Amino acid sequence: PYPLYLTQLMGGTIIDEAYEKNFGQQNSRESILELQYDGSTTVNNTVNTYLSIYEGAAFKPKHMALDPQLISGYGSVNPIIGFGRTDLRMVETAYLQSPDIAKPLVKFTASTVSVNKPENMSDADAFINYSTRTATSNNAHWPVYRLADMMLIKAEAIARYNATLGDNADKNQLREGFKLVNQLFKRSNPALVGS
């Protein structure tokens, strides 16, 4: 019921179409407002300066890196303690193969992501493949608002409003809020729910 991009399972490998469309390509159907960069006249230097760059066949962290605590519980599936082992958002965010404790960020530097072991991306033999943008031609648009953001904002508003109603909470609204969040969870964890 929601016009979200989904992941594709091809021969045991997850092709993360949602990441590619939203962060690799520009102006996806899920995008509501994006800052535009063309990679030559306007380069996304925010990514190059603060997040990471890809040069010399490696992701190199800049001023920001992923807090190791977000991946300390990566072996489990418990969103309260950080990313779970089946959560595509982890490999969309950080370069797990880095030997550094604080992993370099890959979001906006990587243009595509694929994973051969989606049921446990924390395994040493899980192969995560990225297509990347170079520092000198980073054309990654910066999504300010996406459909996923609006879905989460709506679910949060439903939950907060109904919390004030106590026993009179609207069960239909609560179901709608749950469906919104669950749709995003299923997209990010295809190994748990199938494709």
Task: List each language-model region with its residue ranges.
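Elongated scaffold/linker segments in the mid-to-C-terminal portions of large proteins
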Residues: 2-162
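Boundary/linker segments of alpha-helical solenoid repeat arrays
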Residues: 191-194
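Intrinsically disordered, low-complexity Ser/Thr- and acidic-rich flexible linkers and loops
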Residues: 164-171
